[in-house]
Amino acid sequence: MALSCSKVLSFYLSPVVGGGDVPKKLTFSSFLGLSKGVGGSRSSRVCAASNAPAPLAGVIFEPFQELKKDYLAVPIAHNVXLARQNYADDSESAINEQINVEYNVSYVYHALFAYFDRDNIALKGLAKFFKESSEEEREHAEQLIKYQNIRGGRVVLHPITSPPSEFEHSEKGDALYAMELALSLEKLTNEKLLHVHSVAERNNDPQXADFIESEFLYEQVKSIKKIAEYVAQLRLVGKGHGVWHFDQKLLHDEDHV
């Protein structure tokens, strides 16, 4: 009996008795040569018909031919990434550098949290703000780590600089000084992110460019705008009683980061 499957390839289901001849198979018959014994003496096998027509003209994609390209070969060495594709070495390095940037900024914010949480400073709103800011930057670093692994890169954690522990400023006061420092850090982080984006574009890596754009760049300019407003407000209230009111606003504001 005959089994027709398409105009490109045709197959028939032939009974095989004992060791009879089996029709000639296609070159990728290893994917199609299925057999099942029945009663131990008679079986059925899917085979290519010897009169199968030639492939249709105009075929634009032949996967098994395409897979012969060397750069699509799956690595055998156990220490080589299997997922890596179109991921340049300098893109990998730029992501590792950005991980370090995020951890460093997180560390500075954590130092600010510790400072404002002191018993003789006791600006709980600022302590809360910088603690949450530190956690956010650390989450960014972890997000970059996950992306590095997705692309088949290797995470390299660089040393983190120790931040200062004192943030008193005789002219500006500690609150304004700390918030201006935070604004500068956010602008610096944005500059570093733009560098990572430019590296991705230079290497024709739209996936990395899209990752930086969609996950970081817009949120970064929002953070810059928010902290710039805080700097402006602290400049208005001065170093006295107004700082306490500003701090209370931060303490009870659930959407300040």
UniProtKB/Swiss-Prot annotation:
Protein name from the UniProt record: Ferritin-2, chloroplastic
Function, as annotated: Stores iron in a soluble, non-toxic, readily available form. Important for iron homeostasis. Has ferroxidase activity. Iron is taken up in the ferrous form and deposited as ferric hydroxides after oxidation.
Binding residues for Fe cation 1: E102, E137, H140
Span of the transit peptide along the chain: 1-51
Region (Extension peptide (EP)): 52-84
Subunit and interaction comment: Oligomer of 24 subunits. There are two types of subunits: L (light) chain and H (heavy) chain. The major chain can be light or heavy, depending on the species and tissue type. The functional molecule forms a roughly spherical shell with a diameter of 12 nm and contains a central cavity into which the insoluble mineral iron core is deposited.
Keywords: Chloroplast, Iron, Iron storage, Metal-binding, Oxidoreductase, Plastid, Transit peptide
Family stated for the protein in its record: Belongs to the ferritin family.
Catalyses which reaction(s): 4 Fe(2+) + O2 + 4 H(+) = 4 Fe(3+) + 2 H2O
Organism: Glycine max
